[in-house]
């Protein structure tokens, strides 16, 4: 079966593993997925992420993060721009997630970055997802 939206599949794997308190989750790798995983790590939503070379496209392994009493660090994860309906934001329309408590991951002309960094650099682009 052909996968029409690999990024949505990646986010769903993370969401499902987070819901059932898994320690780690694996997904097929791509440049975009690596960039998203690194942003999640840098923003403190996941413990760590690593790339495993399997001779094909590779695998991304993400170690999920939980609080001391098993509270989820990732409360929500939502795909915004989909293959059937792309969502773009100009530099003055970059969204804030939960008043700045969450992040929007945006694909800009200078790479994939958070909404804060895009606003700081004065860039717009495709809104990939929201994480809170």
Swiss-Prot record:
Pfam families referenced in this protein's UniProt entry, alphabetically: Ribosomal_S8
SUPFAM superfamilies recorded: Ribosomal protein S8
Keyword Ribosomal protein applies: yes
A GO cellular component annotation in the UniProt record: ribosome
Top-level taxon of the source organism: Bacteria
Function: One of the primary rRNA binding proteins, it binds directly to 16S rRNA central domain where it helps coordinate assembly of the platform of the 30S subunit.
InterPro entries: Ribosomal_uS8, Ribosomal_uS8_CS, Ribosomal_uS8_sf
Source taxonomy: Bacteria, Bacillati, Bacillota, Clostridia, Eubacteriales
Record GO terms (molecular function): rRNA binding; structural constituent of ribosome
Protein name, per record: Small ribosomal subunit protein uS8
Native source organism of the sequence: Pelotomaculum thermopropionicum (strain DSM 13744 / JCM 10971 / SI)
Family note: Belongs to the universal ribosomal protein uS8 family.
Keyword Ribosomal protein among record annotations: yes
GO terms (BP aspect): translation
């Amino acid at each position: 079966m052909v996968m029409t939206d690999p990024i949505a599949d990646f986010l769903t794997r993370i969401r499902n593993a987070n819901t059932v308190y898994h320690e780690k989750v694996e997904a097929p790798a791509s440049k975009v997925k690596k960039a998203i995983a690194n942003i999640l790590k840098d923003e403190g939503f996941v413990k760590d992420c690593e790339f495993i070379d399997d001779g094909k496209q590779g695998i991304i392994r993400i170690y999920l993060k939980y609080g001391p009493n098993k509270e989820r660090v990732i409360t929500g994860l939502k795909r915004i721009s989909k293959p059937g309906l792309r969502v773009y934001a100009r530099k003055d329309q970059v969204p804030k997630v939960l008043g700045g408590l969450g992040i929007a991951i945006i694909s800009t002309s200078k790479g994939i970055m958070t909404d804060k960094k895009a606003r700081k650099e004065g860039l717009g682009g495709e809104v990939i997802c929201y994480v809170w």
